[in-house]
Amino acid sequence: MIAMKPARTLAMAGALALFASQAAHAQWLDLYGTRKNVSASPAAPMLKNATCQPELADRPIELEDAILQAICANPQARRAWADARAQAAQLGVKEAAYLPTLNATAGIQRNWQTTTYEQDLGPITLTADQKQIQTSRYGALNLSWVLFDFGKRSAALRQARELLAAANATQDDTLQTLLFNAAQAYYNLRDTQAALDAARTTERVAQDSLTAAKAKHDAGAGTLSDQLQAQTSYRRAVLDRVSAEGDVRNATGVLAVAMGLDANTPLRIATAEPPVDRNAFAEGIAQLIDEAKRQHPKLVAARAKLDAARANVDAVRAQGRPTISLTGSLSRNSPSYQQQPGIQTTASHGSMIGVQVTIPLFEGFASGYRVAAAQAQADAQEADVQNTELNVSLDVWKSYQSLQTDTANLDNSKDLLGDAQRSLDIARGRYKAGVGTFTELLNAQTALADAQKQRVQALSKWRTARLKLAASLGSIGLWSAH
């Protein structure tokens, strides 16, 4: 019986385990430098010199705080970043196709076999057992290296690069969308707070008018009708104030969610009103549309996907071309036989190297259909690019016109508010002096409330139009949110 050689067996097993562990560890190494093609963090493309703040400071939230929290904590940013990293890894897969593949196979097995022979000698039957034990150890290394594939790998690599560019552009677009939503939610909360302040002012004015009407009625100088009208106006003002308080709570929840927080998170924003910058976007509409067509991330992503689709056409065409590969192998087989009465041991080992040419000859005309499908996908993507260009130009046009209108209404709403305030002061004085009617006072009071709402809406619409124009240009950033 042949004794097994445990040292050699353990050495072979250890070598294979070491090789396997190194191969498994290599998959975590970015040998092709693909990580440099994606951002270092989910919010890095938008942050520039700013930094993420893990916790909000104990102070009123500024607009920049809300934006940073939104792009740093919102799960949509992490999802877009993960998609970009996944596509970068796919680029590494395509790069790896240019290197050879090496596979190892090894094993050991032991077989036992017993054969019983019987011979009948009349009254006596002779029985003999023959035992055979086979131990086999084998190992092999197989090498395969594609030398020429007539453009298949290069087309696949080009496709992966374009898809990575599209993923990066999509990440940029996601961050800009998050910034826009956070800024809009922040300004919406500020606008609802301003509307609440206006509602409280209207309530105080209505209460003052009610007090004056009641005093005149008690003194016998006013009518009960005037007092009831004043009381009705006051009740309406209270209803408007309560509704405004609900709008503030809703707007607070929207901002919290935009910042990646729970909707019930209490927030306190700064009340200081930023200066109105009328000089932004002073370029002509044609120049703005051209700028959007150059840099809008949606268009950048669409064009990259078009280039990837065209590269896929080349890759599909190359599948029908020959492939030339270098192949090689090293093998060893050491079976050992132990049987009665003798011992037999054999071993074999060999090596091979060669060049293999694979030529697709016929596959049922499937290659032509694959090329046609890939070309149709490229045509569809080209149509998507044209459609995206039209949508971008329309968004820029509408946002630009809205900004022009809302900018003009800033002065109009300011003048309207001033006139309404002076009208109320005059009507109140005339009513107290007994020369004016309560209807005149009530009309002036209503006009002031409307003017306050118009002013709040004018500022809100101007800021929203400015944000939308920046977003339609694909250039929204921390600076444009202000």
Spans of features found by a protein language model:
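A glycine-/polar-enriched beta->alpha junction
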Residues: L68-R78, R85-T101, D129, I133, ...
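Periplasmic alpha-helical coiled-coil/stalk elements that build and connect Gram-negative outer-membrane
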Residues: D173-E291, S402, D406, L448-A449, ...
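Small/polar, glycine/serine/threonine/aspartate-rich low-complexity segments that form flexible
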Residues: K48-R59, T105-N142, T271-A282, D314, ...
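Amphipathic alpha-helical coiled-coil segments
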Residues: R79-E95, T174, L178-D197, D208, ...
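Bacterial N-terminal signal peptides
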Residues: A11-A20
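Bacterial Sec-pathway N-terminal export signals of envelope proteins
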Residues: A26-L99, N103, Q113, A270-L306, ...
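Acidic, low-complexity, intrinsically disordered peripheral segments
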Residues: A3-A7, M12, H25-N37, W112, ...
